[in-house]
Structure formats: C-alpha cells, structure tokens
C-alpha cells in the first residue's frame, strides 16, 4: 500500500496488540475460557440490540449467528465436551457437537446449520439484502438459545445479559 496514512495505521494497530493491556473491556476480564465465550455472547446480543435500533440489519444478523455459536461453545467447554484450546472452524461441525452432547436434538442442530448455510452467507456477501424482520427474528433466536443454554448451566449467574 502506497498511502503512508494507511501503513502508519497498520503499524499502530499491530503495536496496540503488543502493549500491556490498559482500559480493558469490563466484564470480559475472566480467567475461565468458558466464561469468556459466555460473556462474548452476552456482548454480541447487547450489540445486536443496539444496532437493530439503528437499522444495521446485516450486522445484527451476523452478531446473532456469532452469539449463538459463542453460547454453544460456552456449553461445550463448560460441560467438558471441548477443551478451551480446541478450535472448531466449521460452523456445521459446531452445531453438530452441540447436538452430540445433548444441548438440543440432531434435527435442531441441522436446522441451525442450514439456517447459517442458506442465510448468513447470503446476507454477509450481499447476495440478498437484510431486512428488519430478518434481523429481529435472528436476534430473538439468538436470545432464546442463549437464555436456554445458559439457564441450564451451573454458572448462569455469570451471564451479563
């Protein structure tokens, strides 16, 4: 990149991750990996609600899918079905793992995977334009899944929602 402002910004961004943490985001400064996933999901849901009010439907849909996945990941780690360092890069595989440990049935996991496959990609890559109704329904789905999975855990008091 020839624009020095951009390369300077890239350099500064890299340095910002190398410095000692200051002014960290409240609520996410927990030691347990499962709680980091839980609280990230909480923040994604809060952000989705705010962005929905501002009409940012594409981001609400994206945040809702990620909140669902962080919540499932929280339960996988919490229930000992996944190590904190394990990475599941396939969205479908993550939904399947949730079904395998009984967080929900196989059919529900498959429906989540299909919802992601058919709609998240379409919205994200602008093959379709996000609507308010889609954003609202995705946020509601993410909120309901989060409440159900967190409510059935031993650490529901750690939720920031």
What are these regions (language model features)?
Residues 1-161:
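Terminal alpha-helical segments
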């Amino acid at each position: 990149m020839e624009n020095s402002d951009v390369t300077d910004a890239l350099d500064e961004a890299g340095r910002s991750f190398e410095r000692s943490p200051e002014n960290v985001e409240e609520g996410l400064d927990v030691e347990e990996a499962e709680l980091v996933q839980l609280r990230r999901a909480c923040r994604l849901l809060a952000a989705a609600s705010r962005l929905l009010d501002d009409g940012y439907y594409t981001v609400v849909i994206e945040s809702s899918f990620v909140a669902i996945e962080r919540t499932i990941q929280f339960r996988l780690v919490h229930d000992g079905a996944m190590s904190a360092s394990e990475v599941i890069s396939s969205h479908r595989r993550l939904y399947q793992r949730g079904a395998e440990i009984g967080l929900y049935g196989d059919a529900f996991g498959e429906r989540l995977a299909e919802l992601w496959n058919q709609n998240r990609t379409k919205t994200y890559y602008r093959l379709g334009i996000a609507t308010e109704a889609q954003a609202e329904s995705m946020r509601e789905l993410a909120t309901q899944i989060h409440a159900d999975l967190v409510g059935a855990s031993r650490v529901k008091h750690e939720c920031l929602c």
